[in-house]
Amino acid sequence: MEVIAENRKARFEYFILEEFEAGMILLSSEVKSLRERKANISDAYVTEKKGEIWLNNMHIAEYKAANQKNHKPKRERKLLLHKKEINKLIGQIKTSGITVVPLSIYFNDKGLAKTKIAIVKGKKLYDKRATIKQREWEREKSRLSKNNL
């Protein structure tokens, strides 16, 4: 599994409730650009339109060698999921306080572009502070254990 882009900000700003793996409908120039690791998903989010799941605001840079048939960098991309998963996501999207964001984009073993999306709930400021405090304490513990050896 070759990870192309990761949304590290999502793990800090949200509580992750459930994760899904989804396929994406991409143009050839987008796939070539992804192979060059030219993607950004830090501001991306998932929406629902007419019973389908769409990935919005994901930036895939234009492929340099493409001609006038190049893609738009921030176009909407359709996600491919099973019907049960789509219905579950639609129900969660309509719930207030819950959103769906991509966590990472990668190529699986068969060479297909996949995205890992998650149902998330936003953290409050004090939750973010607690996360920082916990992370710093873990670092301090590892430093102390190294020094005591």
Swiss-Prot record:
Which GO CC terms are listed, alphabetically?
A: cytosol
- Its predominant location is cytoplasm
Q: Which GO terms describe its biological process?
A: trans-translation
Q: Which InterPro entries does the entry mention?
A: SmpB, SsrA-bd_prot
Pfam families found in the cross-reference section: SmpB (PF01668)
Sorted keywords for this record are:
Cytoplasm, RNA-binding
Cited function:
Required for rescue of stalled ribosomes mediated by trans-translation. Binds to transfer-messenger RNA (tmRNA), required for stable association of tmRNA with ribosomes. tmRNA and SmpB together mimic tRNA shape, replacing the anticodon stem-loop with SmpB. tmRNA is encoded by the ssrA gene; the 2 termini fold to resemble tRNA(Ala) and it encodes a 'tag peptide', a short internal open reading frame. During trans-translation Ala-aminoacylated tmRNA acts like a tRNA, entering the A-site of stalled ribosomes, displacing the stalled mRNA.
Give the family from UniProt.
Belongs to the SmpB family.
Supply the name of the protein.
Answer: SsrA-binding protein
Q: Which organism is it from?
A: Wolbachia pipientis subsp. Culex pipiens (strain wPip)
